[in-house]
């Protein structure tokens, strides 16, 4: 595909002028109406730091989720008075002054359930309702019931929810899909964006922007009425992601927006805070201390921004795959994020047209077309033959292949010849016996080899099918489903991530133990079951032998760990 003509930057500068002024107004309006609850590290100050550093709980998220029994200022004053007294017991002080999160009741599924029956039975188990919360609770109230991922995750998560909703729709629970869309719209109206999760300590960042795709999913059931109903919230979310663009000069970045030297507008992940994450406090402090050559605030921001990406953590963000303290998320322009922004612009155009505003629809189409050219120019590695992230420091596309490279295919932003090359690269470098590898690098981080994640399996499967690459798409689905089934047969559960180097093993690495449940795995499994089995003969388990005979592709043996360039 040709690069954009040299005259385009000036033209593009004119295009967004009026539309971005509108967005700036929307963003200010959202800020004015938002009531921002303070996260526990601010509410509790030195007490929070001391409790986390004392490692009273195996999981740092436990105290971040604890609810103060009275005004935090009073608790803090009591702490300052008592902490230096002889015999002071910090654990006792915490137990007296806080209500700790309860352990969820262990769900024991009925015996003899098929995989599909198990998933259908889990939806009510994973459903929560928090219309009201305690005054100083870090949990943010939501007007409708919602489905949580499972395990340590006691709240709703933004991008997880889209893949969970795919499964809810597949199970016929359109009411739950509608409820979750309404909840996210409520968050946009209340806070100006959708936070990472419904916790006060997640408010400083978002996650991969799937809200427009959620509305599009709901429109499959409700028609254009859903698009028209949620157009204002989709516009507000777009304003959040593009906040600051109207003041950007070429070569500058502001929050989540990047303006390259030729005027191309792209996006990056960003967190508004540059402190340790409350839910991983001690770990973040240790990471920052391990690299004294970088300001701690810079490392904290990049750790938080990696959490905003959903890929926390991955060699994708790091200069040295074996050293987390070399991550620099904010200087990388991600291919998956910009694909999702392209899709958001396309859905906004469709929704504007449905609402009768053809002029606005044309503006969004123009923005989407400009972004598509930017993706093709800056996020394609011609030498390697795959999509990749762009490095703002080296001013070059990066060399590393990751599963994020399938996102341009998923949103129909890829050129056909490049989609064909992506199919080859996927089959050669990422396809494994148990599904699609996240990267080909073994770093010990959870978003690296040998782990495979349900959302990335589905993005790849859908993306490849969009471009007629059914053979590789079906290979991914079959390998991943076999892995899920083998694990379920042995453990009687679905898990957050899987080791794809073989089948039947949950994934490892990362900051916490493997979690079961698990929302997005449930959703993707249902979608894939219906993909591999003919409609006239739906399957409740993964068949022992492959139903479709179009493909006999074997995955190429993966190379050992490759360094990130």
From Swiss-Prot:
Keywords: Glycosidase, Hydrolase, Periplasm, Signal. The active site is at 312 (proton donor/acceptor), 496 (proton donor/acceptor). Residues 539-565 are annotated as: Disordered. It catalyses: alpha,alpha-trehalose + H2O = alpha-D-glucose + beta-D-glucose. InterPro entries: 6-hairpin_glycosidase_sf (IPR008928), 6hp_glycosidase-like_sf (IPR012341), Glyco_hydro_37 (IPR001661), Glyco_hydro_37_CS (IPR018232), Trehalase_periplasmic (IPR023720). GO terms for biological process: cellular hyperosmotic response; trehalose catabolic process. One of its GO terms (cellular component) is periplasmic space. It is found in: Periplasm. Substrate binds at residues 152, 159-160, 196, 205-207, 277-279, 310, 511. Pfam families: Trehalase. Its EC number is 3.2.1.28. GO terms for molecular function: alpha,alpha-trehalase activity. Residues 1-30 form the signal peptide. It comes from the Bacteria. The keyword Hydrolase applies. The keyword Nuclease does not apply. Monomer. PANTHER family: TREHALASE. NCBIfam families: PRK13270.1, PRK13271.1. Provides the cells with the ability to utilize trehalose at high osmolarity by splitting it into glucose molecules that can subsequently be taken up by the phosphotransferase-mediated uptake system. Belongs to the glycosyl hydrolase 37 family. This is Periplasmic trehalase. It comes from Escherichia coli O6:H1 (strain CFT073 / ATCC 700928 / UPEC).
């Amino acid at each position: 595909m040709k690069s954009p003509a040299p005259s385009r930057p000036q033209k593009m500068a004119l295009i967004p002028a009026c539309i971005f002024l509108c967005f700036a107004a929307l963003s200010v309006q959202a800020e004015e109406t938002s009531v921002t609850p303070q996260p526990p590290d601010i509410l509790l100050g030195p007490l929070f730091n001391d409790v986390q550093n004392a490692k009273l709980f195996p999981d740092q998220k436990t105290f971040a989720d604890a609810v103060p029994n009275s005004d935090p200022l009073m608790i803090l004053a009591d702490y300052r008075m008592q902490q230096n007294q002889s015999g002071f017991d910090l654990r006792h002080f915490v137990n007296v002054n806080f209500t700790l999160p309860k352990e969820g009741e262990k769900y024991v599924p009925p015996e003899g359930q098929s995989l599909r029956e198990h998933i259908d039975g889990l939806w009510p188990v994973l459903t929560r309702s928090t219309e009201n919360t305690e005054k100083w609770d870090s949990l943010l109230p939501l007007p409708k019931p919602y489905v949580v991922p499972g395990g340590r995750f006691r709240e709703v998560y933004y991008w997880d929810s889209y893949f969970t909703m795919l499964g809810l729709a597949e199970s016929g629970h359109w009411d739950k899909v509608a409820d979750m869309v309404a909840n996210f719209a409520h968050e946009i109206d209340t806070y100006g964006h959708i936070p990472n999760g419904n916790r006060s300590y997640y408010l400083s960042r978002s996650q991969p922007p799937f809200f427009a795709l959620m509305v599009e999913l709901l429109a499959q059931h409700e028609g254009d009425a859903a698009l028209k109903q949620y157009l204002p919230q989709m516009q507000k979310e777009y304003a959040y992601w593009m906040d600051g663009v109207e003041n950007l000069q070429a070569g500058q970045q502001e929050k989540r927006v990047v303006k390259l030297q030729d005027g191309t507008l792209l996006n990056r992940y960003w967190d508004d805070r540059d402190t340790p994450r409350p839910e991983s406090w001690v770990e973040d402090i240790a990471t920052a201390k391990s690299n004294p050559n970088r300001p701690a605030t810079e490392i904290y921001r990049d750790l938080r921004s990696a959490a905003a990406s959903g890929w926390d953590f991955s060699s994708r963000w790091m200069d040295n795959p074996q050293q987390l303290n070399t991550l620099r998320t904010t200087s990388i322009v991600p291919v998956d994020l910009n694909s999702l922004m392209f899709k958001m612009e396309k859905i906004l155009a469709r929704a504007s047209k449905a609402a009768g505003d053809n002029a606005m629809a044309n503006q969004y189409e123009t923005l989407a077309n400009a972004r598509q050219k930017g993706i093709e120019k800056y996020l394609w590695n011609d030498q390697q033959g795959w999509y990749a992230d762009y490095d703002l420091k080296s001013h070059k596309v990066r060399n590393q292949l990751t599963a994020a490279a399938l996102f341009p295919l998923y949103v129909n932003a890829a050129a056909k010849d490049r989609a064909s090359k992506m199919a080859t690269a996927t089959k050669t470098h990422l396809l494994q016996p148990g599904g699609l590898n996240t990267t080909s690098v073994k770093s010990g981080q959870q978003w690296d080899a040998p782990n495979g994640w349900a959302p990335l399996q589905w993005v790849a499967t859908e993306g490849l099918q969009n471009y007629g690459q059914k053979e590789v798409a079906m290979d991914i689905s079959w390998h991943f489903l076999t892995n899920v089934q083998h694990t379920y047969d042995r453990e009687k559960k679905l898990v957050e991530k899987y080791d794809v180097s073989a089948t039947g093993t949950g994934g490892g690495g990362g900051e916490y133990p493997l979690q079961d449940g698990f929302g997005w795995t449930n959703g993707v499994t249902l979608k894939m079951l219906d993909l591999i089995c003919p409609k006239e003969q739906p399957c409740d388990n993964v068949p022992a032998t492959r139903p479709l005979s179009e493909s006999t592709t074997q995955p190429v043996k993966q190379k050992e760990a490759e360094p990130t360039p």
